[in-house]
Swiss-Prot record:
Residues 352-433 form the PA domain. Its EC number is 3.4.21.-. Keywords: Autocatalytic cleavage, Glycoprotein, Hydrolase, Protease, Secreted, Serine protease, Signal, Zymogen. It comes from Arabidopsis thaliana (Mouse-ear cress). The keyword Transcription regulation does not apply. The gene is SBT4.2. Residues 1-24 form the signal peptide. One of its GO terms (molecular function) is serine-type endopeptidase activity. Its main location: secreted. This is Subtilisin-like protease SBT4.2.
C-alpha cells in the first residue's frame, strides 16, 4: 500500500513536470522577437534557392514542422539572409551555424526629421543633359510618397529606362508613371505617404520642377530636386512608430536588384557595429554594384560623438544653412521692432493685440506654469497674442482663441508654419519684450508677416545636427558633408518641397518647409545623381570622393566642433563633376580594413561571397584606407607622429601636374611626399604619404585640423587633416 502511494505521488510529480514543459516553451515563444540572420553575399550556384535554404536552417533551429509561420522575410535578390521570429535560445543556436555572419534584433529606426539647389550652384543654368539625366534612378527608402504631387509629375520625361528591373507594386490607391517608375511597400497596404517625410525627401532628391511655389506667399520660387528629370523608385519601410530593421534590409535587397543608381535613406538607429546594422549591410552590397548610398547623421545636437550611420562606404550628411533666412518681426506697443524667426503667413495687418503673459493668460494655474504656457493653463487668451517662456502648445492656444504667439527659443532653427501667427525671439530680444510686458499696464503688440532676406553668414551647421567624431571607425572622419538641410521647401506630401497630404497643423498647404538632417541627406543624393548623369561610369567611391574633395571649406569660427560638425565642407555640385583627382576604394580595401578590426576570415569570406584570407600583410588600418579625408585619434598627453598613405586617380586632363599645398594649424607639422604628382593620361594612379607631427594637445584643444590641397591650377582637390584626442 505504501509502495502504491509512493508510485501515485511520483506519477503526479512526473505528470506535473510534463505539463509544465509545454507551458515554459509557450511562455518563451510569446516572448520571441524578430531577429535578422545576415549571411553575406549570395552563393554563385545557379541552383541555389535562398528561401529553401533559410527554411532548412529554421527547421534545425525551431524544431517545428511549420517554419513558414516564423519566417518573416527571406533576402535573396542582392544578398543572403532572412528575418524570423525566434526565442532567445533559438537565436543563440542560430548564431553558431555555418554561413551565418551575424544575428541581431530587428530594432526600430527613426526618421531624422526652393532655394537650396540654387545656393549650391545647381540652378537652371547647371550643366545637365536631359536625355542622360532621365536615365538616372534614385531609390528612396523612407515612408512612401504622395504620387499626385506635381513634384512627381512625368511631364517632359521620356520612356522608362530599359535598365530598370523593378516593378510598381505600390498597393492600394497608388499609381506609378514615367517619373515614379517603381514602388514597393513593406508596411501597411500602400506605398502612399502618411506623414509627408517620404514625399519631402523624394522630391528633394529628384522632384520635377514646379514653378511659382510658395508657402502661402512666403519664399516664392521653383521647387526642384537635384535631378528634375531623374526617375524615382519608392520603398516604404516606415510607419508613424518607426522603421523596422528587417523592412529596411528588405528594401535594400529589392532596390539593388531593381537597378537604382543612388539610394537616399534618412533614418538612423544608433547601431554600434556594421555587421549588425541593416543600413551598413545593405549599403555595402549596394556599393559593390556601384550604387551610392546617402544617409543622415542625425539630429542629436552639439554633443560630441553622437553622429549616426558611420560606415565608410556611406555618404554621411550633416545639416547646413543656405543664404536665405526667414525674418518675422515683432512690434510692441511702443513701436519697438524686435527681429524674430519663424515662417508666419498670417497677416495681422499691423493691428496691435493685447499681450497675454503669466497671470493675464491664465487664472487657474501658477504664474510659473502660465508663463511657460503649460497645457491646461491658457484659459484667458481669446483675442490676444500669447507670450511664452518656452515653445509650447500652439494648437492649444489656437483652440483657446489666441490670434498669435511669441515664443522664446535658444537654438538657431526656425519653427514651421503654425495654425496662428507665430514668431520666435532669441534671448536678448525676448527679454526686451518680457520687460516691456511686465512694466506696461496695458501691453500690446503685433506679429508681422515673414520676410525672406539674404543671410550673408551662411553656411553654418545648425545646433540640431549631430556631431562626430566617428565612434565606430575612430580614424575616419564622420559627417563627410554639410548640406543644405535647414528649411528646404519641398512637396510636403512638398528646402520648398512637396507635402501632398496637407499635414501642417491647422492649415492646408501643398508645399512646405522641413528641417533636420533628413532633409540634408536627399540633397546630397540629388548631387550624387547629378554627378552620375555626367560621369555614369564612375564607381560609388569615386563619386563620393568627388563630392568630398570639391566641397567648400567652412569656417571653424562659426562651428566650434569644426570638422566634427561639417566634415569635408559644404557640397559644391557643379565642381564635383570635374574634381581632377579621385580617391578610389575597392570592395577588397573595405574587407582588408575589416580584417584589422578583428572580423574573422570566415565571416569576411561570407560577406564577400568568396574565399578571403586575413593576413598580416593584407590588413589595412583605418588610417590607411584610401579615404578622401585623413583623421587620427591620438593620446592627449603625448606628441604624435602619424603617417597616412593615399593613392589618387587622374580623372582630368592628360599631361597634368598637381602640387601639394598645405593650410592649417601651426600646432601641426605636415610633410607630403612626393609634393608633386604628374599624370600622363586619365586613369593613371599616383601614391603619396602625408606625415603629421605635433606636440601634446593636452590643454590646447580636443581637435586640431589642417588641409591638403592638390592643385594643377584649375582643380583644387582638398582633403581635411584632423588630429583629435
Amino acid at each position: 500500500m505504501a509502495s502504491l502511494g509512493l508510485f501515485l505521488c511520483l506519477s503526479s510529480v512526473l505528470l506535473m513536470s510534463l505539463c509544465q514543459v509545454p507551458t515554459a516553451i509557450e511562455d518563451e515563444r510569446k516572448a520571441s522577437h524578430v531577429y535578422i540572420a545576415y549571411m553575406g553575399a549570395l552563393p554563385s550556384k545557379i541552383s541555389y534557392s535562398p528561401m529553401s535554404h533559410h527554411q532548412n536552417i529554421l527547421q534545425e533551429v525551431i524544431e517545428s514542422s511549420s517554419v513558414e509561420d516564423y519566417l518573416v522575410r527571406s533576402y535573396g535578390r542582392s544578398f543572403n539572409g532572412f528575418a524570423a521570429k525566434l526565442t532567445e535560445s533559438e537565436k543563440d543556436k542560430l548564431i553558431g551555424m555555418e554561413g551565418v555572419v551575424s544575428v541581431f534584433p530587428s530594432t526600430v529606426y527613426k526618421l531624422f526629421t526652393t532655394r537650396s539647389y540654387e545656393f549650391m550652384g545647381l540652378g537652371d543654368k547647371s550643366n545637365n543633359v536631359p536625355e542622360v539625366e532621365s536615365n538616372v534612378i534614385v531609390g528612396v527608402i523612407d515612408g512612401g510618397i504622395w504620387p499626385e504631387s506635381k513634384s512627381f509629375s512625368d511631364e517632359g520625361i521620356g520612356p522608362i529606362p530599359k535598365k530598370w528591373k523593378g516593378t510598381c507594386a505600390g498597393g492600394t490607391n497608388f499609381t506609378c508613371n514615367r517619373k515614379v517608375i517603381g514602388a514597393r511597400h513593406y508596411v501597411h497596404d500602400s506605398a502612399r505617404d502618411s506623414d509627408a517625410h517620404g514625399s519631402h525627401t523624394a522630391s528633394t532628391a529628384a522632384g520635377n520642377k514646379v514653378k511659382g511655389v510658395s508657402v502661402n506667399g512666403v519664399a516664392e520660387g521653383t521647387a526642384r530636386g537635384g535631378v528634375p528629370l531623374g526617375r524615382i523608385a519608392v520603398y516604404k519601410v516606415c510607419e508613424p512608430l518607426g522603421c523596422n530593421g528587417e523592412r529596411i534590409l528588405a528594401a535594400f535587397d529589392d532596390a539593388i536588384a531593381d537597378g537604382v543608381d543612388v539610394l537616399t535613406i534618412s533614418l538612423g538607429g544608433g547601431v554600434t557595429k556594421v555587421d549588425i546594422d541593416p543600413i551598413a549591410i545593405g549599403s555595402f552590397h549596394a556599393m559593390t554594384k556601384g550604387i551610392v548610398t546617402t544617409v543622415a547623421v542625425g539630429n542629436a545636437g552639439t554633443a560630441l560623438a553622437k553622429a549616426d550611420n558611420l560606415a565608410p562606404w556611406l555618404i554621411s550628411v550633416a545639416a547646413g544653412s543656405t543664404d536665405r533666412k526667414f525674418v518675422t518681426n515683432v512690434v510692441n506697443g511702443d513701436d519697438k521692432m524686435l527681429p524674430g524667426r519663424s515662417i508666419n503667413d498670417f497677416d495681422l495687418e499691423g493691428k496691435k493685440y493685447p499681450l497675454a503673459y503669466g497671470k493675464t493668460a491664465s487664472n487657474n494655474c501658477t504664474e510659473e506654469l502660465a508663463r511657460g504656457c503649460a497645457s491646461g493653463c491658457l484659459n484667458t487668451v481669446e483675442g490676444k497674442i500669447v507670450v511664452c517662456d518656452v515653445p509650447n502648445n500652439v494648437m492649444e492656444q489656437k483652440a483657446a482663441g489666441a490670434v498669435g504667439t511669441i515664443l522664446h527659443v535658444t537654438d538657431v532653427d526656425t519653427p514651421g508654419l503654425g495654425p496662428i501667427a507665430v514668431a520666435t525671439l532669441d534671448d536678448t530680444n525676448y527679454e526686451e519684450l518680457r520687460s516691456y510686458v511686465l512694466s506696461s499696464p496695458n501691453p500690446q503688440g503685433t506679429i508681422l508677416k515673414t520676410n525672406t532676406v539674404k543671410d550673408n553668414g551662411a553656411p553654418v551647421v545648425p545646433a540640431f545636427s549631430s556631431r562626430g567624431p566617428n565612434t565606430l571607425f575612430s580614424d575616419i572622419l564622420s559627417n563627410e558633408h554639410s548640406k543644405r538641410n535647414n528649411r528646404p521647401m519641398s512637396q510636403y506630401i512638398s528646402s520648398i518641397f512637396t507635402t501632398g497630404s496637407n499635414r501642417v497643423p491647422g492649415q492646408s498647404v501643398d508645399y512646405y518647409f522641413m528641417t533636420g538632417t533628413s532633409m540634408a541627406c536627399p540633397h546630397v543624393a540629388g548631387v550624387a545623381a547629378y554627378v552620375k548623369t555626367l560621369r555614369p561610369d564612375w564607381s560609388a567611391s569615386a563619386i563620393k570622393s568627388a563630392i568630398m574633395t570639391t566641397a567648400w571649406a567652412m569656417n571653424a569660427s562659426k562651428n566650434a566642433e569644426a570638422e566634427f560638425a561639417y566634415g569635408s565642407g559644404f557640397v559644391n555640385p557643379t565642381v564635383a563633376v570635374d574634381p581632377g583627382l579621385v580617391y578610389e576604394i575597392a570592395k577588397e580595401d573595405y574587407l582588408n580594413m575589416l580584417c584589422s578590426l578583428d572580423y574573422s576570415s570566415q565571416g569576411i569570406s561570407t560577406i564577400a561571397g568568396g574565399t578571403f584570407t586575413c593576413s598580416e600583410q593584407s590588413k589595412l588600418t583605418m588610417r590607411n584606407l584610401n579615404y578622401p579625408s585623413m583623421s587620427a585619434k591620438v593620446s592627449a598627453s603625448s606628441s604624435s607622429d602619424i603617417t597616412f598613405s593615399r593613392t589618387v586617380t587622374n580623372v582630368g586632363e592628360k599631361g597634368s601636374t598637381y602640387k601639394a599645398k598645405l593650410s592649417g594649424n601651426p600646432k601641426l607639422s605636415i610633410k607630403v611626399e612626393p609634393a608633386t604628382l604628374s599624370f600622363k593620361a586619365p586613369g593613371e594612379k599616383k601614391s603619396f604619404t602625408v606625415t603629421v607631427s605635433g606636440k601634446s594637445l593636452a590643454g590646447i584643444s580636443n581637435i586640431v585640423s589642417a588641409s591638403l590641397i592638390w592643385s594643377d591650377g584649375s582643380h583644387n582637390v582638398r582633403s581635411p587633416i584632423v588630429v583629435y584626442t
